[in-house]
Amino acid sequence: MSHHKKRVYPQAQLQYGQNATPLQQPAQFMPPQDPAAAGMSYGQMGMPPQGAVPSMGQQQFLTPAQEQLHQQIDQATTSMNDMHLHNVPLVDPNAYMQPQVPVQMGTPLQQQQQPMAAPAYGQPSAAMGQNMRPMNQLYPIDLLTELPPPITDLTLPPPPLVIPPERMLVPSELSNASPDYIRSTLNAVPKNSSLLKKSKLPFGLVIRPYQHLYDDIDPPPLNEDGLIVRCRRCRSYMNPFVTFIEQGRRWRCNFCRLANDVPMQMDQSDPNDPKSRYDRNEIKCAVMEYMAPKEYTLRQPPPATYCFLIDVSQSSIKSGLLATTINTLLQNLDSIPNHDERTRISILCVDNAIHYFKIPLDSENNEESADQINMMDIADLEEPFLPRPNSMVVSLKACRQNIETLLTKIPQIFQSNLITNFALGPALKSAYHLIGGVGGKIIVVSGTLPNLGIGKLQRRNESGVVNTSKETAQLLSCQDSFYKNFTIDCSKVQITVDLFLASEDYMDVASLSNLSRFTAGQTHFYPGFSGKNPNDIVKFSTEFAKHISMDFCMETVMRARGSTGLRMSRFYGHFFNRSSDLCAFSTMPRDQSYLFEVNVDESIMADYCYVQVAVLLSLNNSQRRIRIITLAMPTTESLAEVYASADQLAIASFYNSKAVEKALNSSLDDARVLINKSVQDILATYKKEIVVSNTAGGAPLRLCANLRMFPLLMHSLTKHMAFRSGIVPSDHRASALNNLESLPLKYLIKNIYPDVYSLHDMADEAGLPVQTEDGEATGTIVLPQPINATSSLFERYGLYLIDNGNELFLWMGGDAVPALVFDVFGTQDIFDIPIGKQEIPVVENSEFNQRVRNIINQLRNHDDVITYQSLYIVRGASLSEPVNHASAREVATLRLWASSTLVEDKILNNESYREFLQIMKARISK
């Protein structure tokens, strides 16, 4: 078809009713700037005057589908005039082109008479989709001419969810869920499965129910009156997108369209604080909580229970792990959540036997109180029994002093222990019987490979298997079925297993991580841990302390409901999948994210669809609550609109989860193929269906601006330790895979594409506190602008900081001037600076040293994850570097490791990003 040859434009691609927009339009999805401000006329910009409707006589560049819909517009408009939708206001399609009266945000639409507001600056422009609704525009770019890629796009918000205010009962920014809680890969949902399949874009939801480690930080609004209004048919909860009908006596569900009665209690309020139904949280807020009444509770919410299972074998003692663990517990006993003063503690020590401790109440203390803490050793590992169960799980409040006394005695008891065995399996079963009546957390701290009793593991032979097709089956699979079967038992009694593995030796993370994966826990791995290195101690103790002080909820289930046509099909993350649509969490942590895959099972007739996530939970303050997260999304029959509203970061998270699953269940090669194919399919589909160009190999590599970082993220993911080819120790690879499947989105992106900062030429305000309008300093430090992760931007005399979310690398160029070296390290000789896992020394009277340390501290400051990044100091190559320098080998290893984070470069056998794009272009041109 000849008219297809004209589909490549040096500007935004056109659809019926849209204004042409310059190609230079930024990717922030903002409306075009006023041309008059730039001294240009609208005619020069190729845009009609403000408020004008495009002439029907003007040439329109349309796909066949658009032409067909173009012909149907008059008929559809006429039909709309004849329709009478119950309680749904009809909007004149042409009204979007006329001056609008702003809607008063926060006021119920039933109390307003104004038409819909025109979008404000920073919102999607009023470009009409094929059904005459405002939709996001498509801005084409050429990936090969945008090199290096504009990495600032990684910090942009997703394409807006274009929901007109009249769709909300009380229009406000809180009426639709924030992307911090839930992000859809598609912010314009295809109306049928064939369009979704044709797009080659995935449909999934990235969900993070909690945003902070501690629940008292920015909590959502809470309903405490006990009234919970749900649809009788689909059981969805009342939300800002329902409609009231029959003079407000009934409400229509936005999920299944059923009309339900409105409870009288909705309009009853405290006489001293009169409120209308529109003041209720479920009407105003898409994210809110209910205090659950008794019918949502099978039993009294249990107390928060912690069972610490501590390795006291010889390797744990020699490495300093035991002493570090005990000291951290002693310093943070008062930080363990105990909101209702019911928190309980149990401590088990394990080597070739299980050592229980009877801890008396503080009120029973007397002059011989130290003798009242009895240790009972159980050597029968086949059928271990509980000698005194009632006195081994004790109240933190009632036994606080004696718990501290016990912790101070444990290092003394085992200081001369020569036993090298570690019976983890029997100890887990004992802990299970100890706290199984109420559930809780089993926190394992281990520095030894389990080598005794049930769950005994062997060191695997990695030579000849690493970097082959056998790697997954022989190194990344679970070595003993106990570690999967045990999680089923734990899920039944609400027990989570968390692991802290710290050793210089092999630990079989691939097997042990199953304990946390299926019980909603987490595995933390500290390779090469040594108590002689203070930096190792700081990292372990910081993360362990934040973990045990983190709030969590118990007896938790999470379900996502979709409106008609949508169905949740697959679930990814750390939890137990109890049924086809129910995810069970023995305890729900605050530092993890989850991904749900969505199917379009039947055609969606409505202009908007909805997803609602409900989390039923017991807090560690004796309260039973329900957290509700509701998301509204527009639907479309236009492939261009689907692409224009695609969220590149959420899509990257989707394929990351798919790749982790493929790596664990199939092979690493299959995972890499999946990652690369995701990019190839999207580029090919965009070229075929959107660009529609018949030009040969010289054609540009087109993609829409809102997806231009997606190929970079996927290419970077293939270079991640979890997936890259080459020799990677199996423990490191298994740990990386474990982290990728549970990281919150912003940390996942940083893990895939690290932040790189140039420090030697940073702005004057970088490294200093943010100033308020009054000139007062805040506690937040100004960070430098990041640069692309490529060595081509590294100067031999520069200073650079790399942050991949797990580690920090401070790269000092080998030819740095002595003044810079002195300002940072307090010495002018670059060969005297410390290298490896170190901290920057404090240099008196050096403002630059203070600024660099401030930046590092700011990057380590998190209130939503427990991670503490160790700092590695790397000295760059120099022509003056002595060949036989004492640190030559260590420096070479550090340079190789740090360079592997510069993911735009050619790394080992992996091509550079430019080469990757050339390969993709060649493949889709065939």
Curated annotation (Swiss-Prot):
For this UniProt record, the keywords arranged alphabetically read as follows: Cytoplasm, Cytoplasmic vesicle, Endoplasmic reticulum, ER-Golgi transport, Golgi apparatus, Membrane, Metal-binding, Phosphoprotein, Protein transport, Transport, Zinc
- A Pfam family this chain is assigned to: zf-Sec23_Sec24
Name the positions where Zn(2+) binds.
C231, C234, C253, C256
* PTM sites of type Phosphoserine: S178
Give positions of region: Disordered.
24-50
Which Gene3D superfamilies does the record associate with it?
Answer: beta-sandwich domain of Sec23/24, Sec23/Sec24 helical domain, Severin, von Willebrand factor, type A domain, Zn-finger domain of Sec23/24
Q: How does it sit in the membrane?
A: Peripheral membrane protein
On the tree of life, the source organism's domain of life is Eukaryota
Q: Which cysteines are joined by disulfide bonds?
A: none
One GO term of the cellular component aspect? endoplasmic reticulum membrane
Q: Residues annotated as region Zinc finger-like?
A: 231-256
In the record, the note on similarity to other proteins reads: Belongs to the SEC23/SEC24 family. SEC24 subfamily.
Function of this protein? Component of the coat protein complex II (COPII) which promotes the formation of transport vesicles from the endoplasmic reticulum (ER). The coat has two main functions, the physical deformation of the endoplasmic reticulum membrane into vesicles and the selection of cargo molecules. SEC24 specifically recruits cargo proteins like BET1 or SYS1 to the COPII vesicles. The SEC23/24 complex is also involved in internalization of plasma membrane proteins like the maltose transporter.
Q: Partners and quaternary state?
A: The COPII coat is composed of at least 7 proteins: the SEC23/24 complex, the SEC13/31 complex, SFB2, SFB3 and the protein SAR1. Interacts with BET1, EMP24, GRH1, SEC22, SED5 and SYS1.
PANTHER family reported for this sequence: SEC24-RELATED PROTEIN, SECRETORY 24AB, ISOFORM A
The protein's name is Protein transport protein SEC24
Q: Which organism is it from?
A: Saccharomyces cerevisiae (strain ATCC 204508 / S288c)
What gene name is listed for this protein?
SEC24
